[in-house]
Regions:
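Acidic (Asp/Glu-rich) catalytic motifs at the cytosolic membrane interface
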Residues: 34-45, 154-172, 224-265
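A short, terminal or domain-edge coil/loop segment
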Residues: 81-87, 232-236, 266-270
Length: 277
């Protein structure tokens, strides 16, 4: 718990600087993308793969600097790659569920190499494009609310579901136990209620981005997406026999362990902005 607090206190000033300075935002997101390409290697030493993705990322930033209209494509690519990767994620879990052992060591015997390859690459594209979609959501300082709303809501969801779930959660969902064995029913309920209430209140009283009717719809979809994003990442880690994506953030694990719910909700907000534009 204390590690989580210390990590949050360290990250908060970086986020503030990122939204004060465009250059720092660029460097901050570039650093996150580099860490994502490393973490999605998933224990494999594939440095050529990292260099390839870094080249793609730098090309995207170059196009942005040359004023090419590529902002919106990050949202579409993230949605498409996310949808495709779900198929490989579920396929891997179904085919190898007998090899998943959470009490001792997770076995990788009998894994489908082709399926794991496509799962790793499609999920990496989703993560990277999801992070880069922030450039579409946040194009000027006046649009800071578009970023603060999902970030604050996800923070509330993670905090309350973790506290309530760890203190009062006993009953687990057998359907999801193979993916996330430590999550409880009360934790999921808390996540949904927290996301619904916090999103609607923040939008209505502070940010005023969406109309009340639109906010109601997104308030329902938001916590569902946040929880699904967490389960999605957990499924990938189970497929590769990992507990965490990394250990760079004490108390959280890797960068993706902290951003799993954030990225999918950024895509949701990006889609909402597309349809409302």
């Amino acid at each position: 718990m204390y590690d989580r607090v210390r990590t949050s206190l360290f990250i908060s000033p970086l986020l503030i600087l990122a939204f004060i300075s465009e250059i720092f935002l660029f460097l901050f997101l570039l650093s996150i993308c580099i860490l994502i390409t490393y973490e999605t290697n998933l224990n494999a030493k594939k440095y050529t793969r990292i260099y390839t993705y870094l080249l793609i990322i730098f090309t995207y930033f170059l196009l942005l600097s040359l004023n090419y209209n590529v902002l919106i494509y990050a949202v579409y690519i993230s949605l498409l790659s996310f949808t495709v990767s779900i198929f490989f994620n579920i396929l891997g879990l179904r085919k190898n569920k007998e090899n998943l052992n959470f009490t001792n060591q997770i076995s990788l015997d009998g894994k489908d190499v082709v399926n794991l390859f496509f799962l790793r690459e499609t999920s990496t594209i989703y993560y990277l494009s999801g992070v880069l979609s922030i450039f579409f959501i946040y194009q000027s300082p006046s649009e800071i609310n578009w970023v603060l709303l999902p970030l604050l809501t996800v923070f509330a969801i993670d905090s309350f579901s973790y506290i309530i779930g760890s203190r009062f959660g006993q009953r687990k969902l057998k359907l999801l136990e193979i993916i996330s064995p430590n999550k409880t029913l009360i934790g999921y309920i808390t996540a949904f209620l927290t996301g619904f209430i916090v999103f609607y209140i923040l939008n209505y009283f502070f940010f005023n981005i969406f109309s009340p009717s639109t906010s109601l719809v997104i308030s329902i979809a938001f916590p569902i997406c946040a929880v699904f994003g967490d389960l999605y990442s957990s499924g990938i880690k189970r497929n590769f026999g990992l507990k965490d994506y990394g250990n760079i953030l004490p108390g959280h694990g890797g960068v993706l362990d902290r951003l799993d719910s954030v990225i999918i909700t950024l895509v949701l907000i990006g889609l909402a902005k597309v349809f409302l534009s």
